[in-house]
Amino acid sequence: MTTENLVKAGLNEELAADIVRRRNEMDMKILELRDRASRDGYLDTERYARELNELREQDISLRDEIGDEYYDRYLFSSGQGNRVKVASVMMGSPAEMSGMKDGDLILNYDNRRMFNWNELQEATSRGERGEYVNVAVLRNGQMVNLWIPRGPLGIRLTSARVKP
């Protein structure tokens, strides 16, 4: 993460510099913990995992800090994928039965923006299995809303980089 990429995403330079500074401080704390745990012989222990989790709980995700719109722009300006693309739909899957197609870009799952396939996998595992949720996809430049039951979708995913 660089100040330059955050500024390209539309954040003012002072806020961008502050975010980068705080992220660097957190990264250093994690590196220091790892070094200390390695030197003191507790790197692969419950103690290390607990201390690492305590540190990470203090951290605020960049997405939460700057919001979806700026996060989308940040991903794009830093050369990262910012869309979840359906590489293929499995025959007989909930996705196929709901009308999902190869090449669809999944924008939202249950009214939450999706920027990478990990987020989508986590989202499909939340809530009550089988409950129908709205999945907004972009297909050939058109927004399409699909209703799909929670749980495995039956799709293969890739990422795409699309200008916000």
Regions found by a protein language model. Give the residues of each.
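Interdomain regulatory linker/hinge segments that flank or connect interaction modules
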Residues: 1-74
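PDZ-domain C-terminal substructure recognizer with occasional recognition of PDZ-binding tails
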Residues: 46-49, 59-62, 97, 101, ...
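Non-catalytic effector/regulatory segments
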Residues: 51-56, 84-85, 99, 109-110
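Coiled-coil termination/hinge junctions
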Residues: 63-88, 92, 96, 114
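Terminal low-complexity interaction tails
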Residues: 75, 111-112, 125, 143
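Active-site-proximal beta-strand/loop segments in catalytic clefts of secreted hydrolases
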Residues: 89-90, 109, 138
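Conserved PDZ fold ligand-binding element
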Residues: 95-118
